[in-house]
């Protein structure tokens, strides 16, 4: 809700749904700057326990209203995340070029493969020439080979994105990251989009 500038507009969230105070669809809020995007916010109480079964039930109830349902698990590795993500048709493994993040992504992907989930795609986020120039990584192929997941997109480090998410504003059309997001979305939809990588 914060990155969409809607933190003061959310009346119901996942916690409200789990408490039985409202139906899942009633807790869904339309994003102001994108008429085709809706969000169901995480519980305000960080200690709220959400099970994979509850997520599956909520998705089942609301799927007739939407073309796609995106489950954002946040960073970190735990069994809870694996159980929830197993409800998905496609897993997007997101990492930055940082070696620690790459290692975590590799561990997560390996666990998904062990559980029989082959439908994974890799997104490399916050990529800049600096990460390669400073030899933090040799190249993007090194990350792809380490994690072992097919690449679906690279998002360049973008000051416009940093400002937009901090203020809850939409990205300007010329923002490099917006171009990358659009290409990723089209690939998810099944379009044949060339994988072009523009790094600032």
Where are these regions (language model features)?
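Conserved C-terminal guanine-recognition region of P-loop GTPase G domains, centered on the G4
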Residues: 103-117
């Amino acid at each position: 809700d914060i990155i969409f500038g809607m933190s003061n507009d959310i009346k119901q969230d996942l916690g409200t749904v789990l408490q039985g105070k409202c139906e899942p669809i009633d807790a869904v809020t339309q994003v102001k700057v994108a008429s085709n995007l809706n969000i169901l916010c995480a519980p305000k109480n960080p200690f709220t326990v959400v099970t994979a079964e509850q997520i599956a039930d909520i998705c089942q109830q609301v799927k007739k209203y939407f073309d796609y349902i995106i489950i954002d698990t946040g960073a970190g590795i735990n069994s809870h995340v694996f159980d929830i993500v197993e409800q998905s048709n496609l897993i997007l493994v997101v990492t930055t070029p940082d070696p620690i993040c790459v290692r975590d992504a590799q561990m997560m992907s390996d666990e998904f493969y062990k559980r029989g989930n082959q439908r994974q795609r890799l997104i490399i986020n916050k990529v800049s020439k600096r990460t390669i120039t400073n030899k933090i990584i040799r190249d993007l192929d090194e990350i792809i080979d380490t994690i072992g997941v097919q690449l679906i997109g690279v998002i360049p480090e973008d000051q416009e994105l940093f400002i937009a998410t901090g203020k809850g504003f939409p990205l300007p059309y010329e923002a490099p990251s917006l171009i990358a997001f659009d290409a990723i979305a089209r690939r998810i939809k099944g379009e044949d989009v060339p994988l072009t990588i523009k790094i600032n």
